[in-house]
Structures are given as structure tokens and as C-alpha cells.
């Protein structure tokens, strides 16, 4: 019987596999070997797609005459910087004494692609190949993954999607970047007085640039509208509260053109007229309705990568790429499960043994008491019946949760990594606590033929907030009225006459949209459907975002590196640069579809369809090639270069130094 080889994505993961397998292995150059097994590794990608000049040296020179460029057969090559490791891995995979290959690269589309390219370039052939699919790097999970490894062929559709994603990005990047650069780079170069200008566009990157630029322009174009609210101060036994006037149905101001909205006037004079009216005939109002009801707020769903990146941006002011690095570190140290996930739920299988994760947290001091309380409550036993467990909402991996293991690694974490681990643990334990309960009280007061409204709320039962409330978040002040006071006024009866101390006008103004920060931008990319007005189309791309959990942070980084956007490190606020807005305008007046979130999301939905077998790779390829050919030819026929600088001029005023 020959040897088995285990190929991981990086050396650190390979070492964990060797440790879990308890191999008495000797360290070699680029691999480890025992009597029965070999463990080796990639160092990320070892193989990449070849540049056009590898097809034809003449293609090295950029020319519209050679576009569109769509090869019949794509060429690949070993990345020079990692050629040595490729030769080692290639030699091991093709050794005659190796008869079984365990593919242990990251359990996802990109990890699949990394191995398949190596397999292709090494010409491995028909050896037995099995896919190890794991959700954490604990010894128990690694051994389960090996034990339950499926034939690699069962992941062929995922491989097809991975290849197509790469081909799509390659074709759009090569064709559109070359075409737009050849048409517009000299215009931009002259306009901005640059030495050179290459226009970089991409399926996802350009769409995200569009989202950022559109928001910036919405803010610029926003005109603040003042409005004037009327508020009465109600006095009950010496204690006061505010009641706000609103125009409701069958009252004089209902649907009046004088109103900005139901509780605010456009002009201060009209608000003053109302105050005069309400102040006449005594300062009393009648309680015409009072309603008490309890409200429950359930624990939030578990973290996926996007939600975690958003919270880390808000709480710790770190970028999505920094968050991913940290959670990847936590994963490799066995502290948390697989980070590049879109799911916010657990699988049924994991839910059955979730007590192990909870029990492990008893050894983590900040969460020990909560973990012990959850185990004593026994709520984990019925978690599978809740919304937090749903196999249908999981594609590759379940949500990011603590493994309950790896506690020895905590001492070596940076402060920020320890904080990220803490919020993951808090979110996880929250789902085993009951909902937070609030007491709500709403009151309606009548004054002549107008109505005033007051709403109150206080916490009855802390519920999950006991564990979810963290020391990093800014505390909200909900103590304006004490529970005792709210209880007191809650006993007032319909028909009671209440005293009014005064009426006053409170001036406000409408607010412009907020700029994205790195976290809200990630969430926006994940929820692309919000940009689609057509309900049917929105439903069609449900679950598809712009990019994937594994690529979104990299897209933001690429835009920053290209100087198309600026990311404030202190606030994590994202804004376009002047160059970024110019690139946006160039794309808007040429390949407008690249700026459309619905189109970008539909591409991602299509790739998901290839991965699950509902769309053939041939169907997707035809759609992709048609799109590239159509818009490359469209750009070739454009002749608006001389006019487009007038568009740039509109933006220049906002970037004058």
C-alpha cells in the first residue's frame, strides 16, 4: 500500500494536520514525511493565469486592434516567487509511492481553486483524491474532516465556479482596462498633469467605487430642510414629561401643505400659530388613550465575516482587512471556527454538540460565569429548534463561533485580537439567553381638536444583554424617565385631565446621508439587493452580494492602493478621491453596467449557480463572453473624449486645495 499525502494551503495549517495525525514525521525542505504519510503545503497561490503576451508576444503592446481578447484555451503558469515550493509539491503529488491525495486547502471556492491549479500544472492524473472540508482547526475537527473526506470529484462544480470567477475577472480586467486606458488615459493624464495613467476596472471593484462616489454626490447635492416641531411639557404631580404634537387623520393640519412631515412645519411662523392656538383656553389636556404592552428583543444572529468586520470597524476602528487578519489568526490558533463565512446560523450537526464549545469557555475568565450559567439553564439543549440553527442558510460554513479550545493561545494575543475574540464569544453565548423584555407605554392627549403623543420604554428583564453588552460600545442613556415614574403615569385613566406647563417650538433640520465607513461598506456589499427597486429582480438575486466574504476587504484595499478612494485610519470613513470620481465618470459614460450593483450581484449569483449545479459552466461562459465582447466593442466606438473633461470640471471644485 502506498503513501497518503495531505496538502494544505499554508505551512502553519500543514503543521496542525501533522500534529492531529500524530505523525512521527521528519522535516524536509517544503514538506514533512513519515513512514506512511506526507504533509506538504502551498503558500497561497502557486499558479496564476498568464498575461496576454504569453499567447502572442504582439499582445504585450496595448492596442484596440487586438481587443476583445478572449482565448479559446486559457494559459497558466507557476508564479516565479514560489516556483521552488511548486516544484516540491508537484514532485510529491506525482511520486509513484503516493496513491492517495487529501486536499486540505481552505474549505471554500478560493481554496478549491488553489489546489486545482496545482493539480492541473503538475499533471497529477488519476490518483485517488479526497477533499477534506473542515470548520475549525481543532484536532477533533481535522480528524473528522479526514475521516469523512469525500471524493474530490464531488467538488467539481465548485471548482468550475472558481475557474469561471478567475476567468471573468481576468477578461474584464484585461479588456476593459486596456480599452478604457487606450481611449481615456491621455485625457486624464493631461487633465490631472500626471506622468502616466492606467485605468483599472473590475467586475466588483468598479461597482464598489460607484457606490462610494454616488453616496458622496448625494451628500453634496443634499439641501438641508429646516422643520419646526411643537412639544408640550406635561406635569403630573410635580414631575414632567414631553408630549409631541402630530397631525393625524381628521385633525385640521392633516395632509396640510404647511407640513414637512406629520410632526413638523416648514415655516416657524406656522408652528408659532399652532402654539398660540394650543395655549388658548387653559393649559390642560385630556388623556384619550393609554396603552401598555411588553416588547421582546431576541438576541442577534451570530457573526458572519461581514457583521464582524462592521462591528470591529465601529468598536475598534480597524479596517475589514485587519479584522480578517485577526480572525484568521484566531482560527489558526484554534480559538474560533472558519472565518470566511456568509452564514449567521449553526448547522444541525454542530448544534447537537454545542455544549462542548460552551463548556470550553468556562476556562476563559471573562466568559466563564456566563458559560456556566448557560450550561445550568440547559437552553443549549433546545437551540436546534430556534432560528439560530438552519441548514438551508449554510453554503460552505456555519457562523463564526468560539471552538472552546486553544485557550493556551490567549496569552499571546494582541490587545485588539483579544477584544475581537471577546465580542465573538459574547455574540455566541447571547443566543442561549432569553430575549430582553421592555415595558412600553404610549399615551395620547387631546387639546381642543389637536393631539399630543408621548412614548416611554424601560427594561423589565435584561435577558441576553447580560452577556451581549460589552465594554467597548458607547453606552446609550435610556434614563430620562425612571421606571417608577413611567409606572405612575401608566396608572392614569382615560378621561383624566393633565396640566401643561408650556408649549415650545423645537427646531430641527433634515440630515444628509452618512458617508460609509469600512464596516458599513462591507455590509452594503453583502446586501446588494437594497439598490434594486424591481421587487422580482431583487428576489432573484437574494442571497447574492457584491463580491464574497473572502474578497470584500481586498476590494477596498485595492481601491485605496489605486488611489481611487481614501480610508481614514482613525475613523474608518471612506471617501472617493478626485481621481476616483474621474474614473467613475469615465465608466459611467462608457461601460455603465459595471457600476450597477444588480448586475454585479447577478454575476455572483450565477457563480453560486455554477457551484450548486443549477447553471452549467457553458451557460455562464457564453453570458460572460457576450458581455465582454459587447462592451469592449462599445468602448472602441466611443468618441466623447474631448467632451468628458466638462464632466470632470463639475467635480474639480470639491477638490481645490
Where are these regions (language model features)?
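Metal- or metallocofactor-binding catalytic centers and their adjacent structured scaffolds
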Residues: 255-301, 309
Amino acid at each position: 500500500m502506498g503513501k497518503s499525502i495531505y496538502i494544505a494551503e499554508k505551512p502553519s495549517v500543514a503543521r496542525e494536520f501533522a500534529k492531529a495525525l500524530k505523525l512521527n514525521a521528519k522535516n524536509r525542505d517544503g514538506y514533512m514525511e513519515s513512514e506512511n504519510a506526507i504533509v506538504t503545503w502551498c503558500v497561497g497561490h502557486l499558479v496564476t493565469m498568464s498575461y496576454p503576451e504569453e499567447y502572442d508576444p504582439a499582445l504585450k503592446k496595448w492596442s484596440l486592434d487586438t481587443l476583445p481578447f478572449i482565448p479559446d484555451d486559457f494559459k497558466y503558469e507557476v508564479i516565479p516567487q514560489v516556483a521552488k515550493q511548486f516544484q516540491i509539491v508537484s514532485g510529491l503529488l506525482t511520486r509513484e509511492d503516493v496513491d492517495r491525495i487529501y486536499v486540505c486547502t481552505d474549505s471554500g471556492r478560493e481554496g478549491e481553486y488553489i489546489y486545482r491549479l496545482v493539480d492541473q500544472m503538475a499533471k497529477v492524473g488519476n490518483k485517488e483524491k479526497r477533499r477534506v472540508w473542515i470548520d475549525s482547526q481543532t484536532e477533533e475537527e481535522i480528524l473528522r474532516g479526514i475521516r469523512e473526506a469525500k471524493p474530490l470529484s464531488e467538488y467539481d462544480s465548485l471548482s468550475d465556479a472558481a475557474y469561471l470567477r478567475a476567468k471573468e475577472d481576468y477578461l474584464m480586467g484585461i479588456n476593459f482596462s486596456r480599452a478604457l486606458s487606450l481611449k481615456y488615459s491621455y485625457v486624464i493624464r493631461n487633465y490631472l498633469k500626471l506622468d502616466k495613467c492606467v485605468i483599472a476596472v473590475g467586475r466588483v471593484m468598479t461597482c464598489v467605487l460607484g457606490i462610494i462616489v454616488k453616496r458622496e454626490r448625494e451628500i453634496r447635492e443634499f439641501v438641508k430642510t429646516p422643520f419646526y416641531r411643537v412639544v408640550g411639557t406635561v406635569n403630573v404631580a410635580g414631575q414632567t414629561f414631553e408630549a409631541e404634537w402630530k397631525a393625524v387623520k381628521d385633525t385640521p393640519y392633516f395632509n396640510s401643505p404647511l407640513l414637512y412631515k406629520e410632526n413638523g412645519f416648514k415655516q416657524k411662523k406656522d408652528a408659532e400659530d399652532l402654539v398660540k392656538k394650543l395655549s388658548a383656553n387653559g393649559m390642560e389636556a385630556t388623556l384619550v388613550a393609554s396603552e401598555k404592552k411588553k416588547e421582546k428583543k431576541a438576541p442577534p444572529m451570530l457573526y458572519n465575516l461581514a457583521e464582524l468586520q462592521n462591528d470591529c470597524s465601529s468598536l475598534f476602528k480597524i479596517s475589514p482587512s485587519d479584522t480578517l487578519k485577526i480572525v484568521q489568526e484566531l482560527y489558526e490558533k484554534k480559538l474560533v471556527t472558519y472565518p470566511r463565512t456568509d452564514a449567521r446560523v449553526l448547522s444541525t450537526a454542530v448544534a447537537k454538540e454545542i455544549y462542548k464549545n460552551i463548556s470550553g469557555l468556562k476556562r476563559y475568565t471573562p466568559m466563564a460565569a456566563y458559560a456556566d450559567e448557560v450550561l445550568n439553564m440547559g437552553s443549549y439543549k433546545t437551540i436546534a429548534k430556534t432560528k439560530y440553527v438552519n441548514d438551508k442558510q449554510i453554503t460552505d460554513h456555519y457562523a463564526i463561533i468560539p471552538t472552546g479550545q486553544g485557550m493556551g493561545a490567549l496569552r499571546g494575543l494582541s490587545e485588539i485580537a483579544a477584544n475581537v475574540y471577546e465580542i465573538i464569544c459574547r455574540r455566541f453565548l447571547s443566543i442561549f439567553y432569553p430575549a430582553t423584555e421592555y415595558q412600553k407605554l404610549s399615551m395620547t392627549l387631546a387639546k381642543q381638536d389637536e393631539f399630543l403623543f408621548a412614548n416611554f420604554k424601560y427594561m423589565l428583564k435584561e435577558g441576553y444583554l447580560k452577556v451581549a453588552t460589552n465594554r467597548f460600545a458607547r453606552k446609550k442613556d435610556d434614563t430620562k424617565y425612571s421606571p417608577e415614574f413611567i409606572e405612575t403615569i401608566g396608572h392614569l385613566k382615560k378621561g383624566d385631565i393633565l396640566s401643561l406647563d408650556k408649549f415650545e417650538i423645537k427646531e430641527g433640520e433634515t440630515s444628509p446621508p452618512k458617508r460609509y465607513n469600512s464596516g458599513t461598506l462591507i455590509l452594503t456589499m453583502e446586501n446588494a439587493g437594497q439598490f434594486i427597486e424591481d421587487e422580482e429582480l431583487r428576489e432573484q438575486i437574494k442571497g447574492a452580494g457584491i463580491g464574497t466574504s473572502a474578497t470584500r476587504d481586498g476590494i477596498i484595499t485595492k481601491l485605496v492602493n489605486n488611489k481611487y478612494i481614501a480610508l481614514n485610519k482613525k475613523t474608518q470613513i471612506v471617501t472617493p478621491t478626485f481621481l476616483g470620481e474621474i474614473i467613475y465618470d469615465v465608466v459611467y459614460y462608457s461601460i455603465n453596467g459595471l457600476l450597477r450593483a444588480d448586475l454585479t450581484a447577478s454575476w455572483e449569483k450565477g457563480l453560486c449557480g455554477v457551484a450548486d449545479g443549477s447553471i452549467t459552466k457553458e451557460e455562464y461562459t457564453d453570458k460572460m463572453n457576450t458581455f465582454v465582447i459587447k462592451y469592449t466593442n462599445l468602448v472602441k466606438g466611443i468618441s466623447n473624449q474631448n467632451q468628458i473633461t466638462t464632466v470632470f470640471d463639475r467635480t474639480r471644485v470639491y477638490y481645490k486645495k
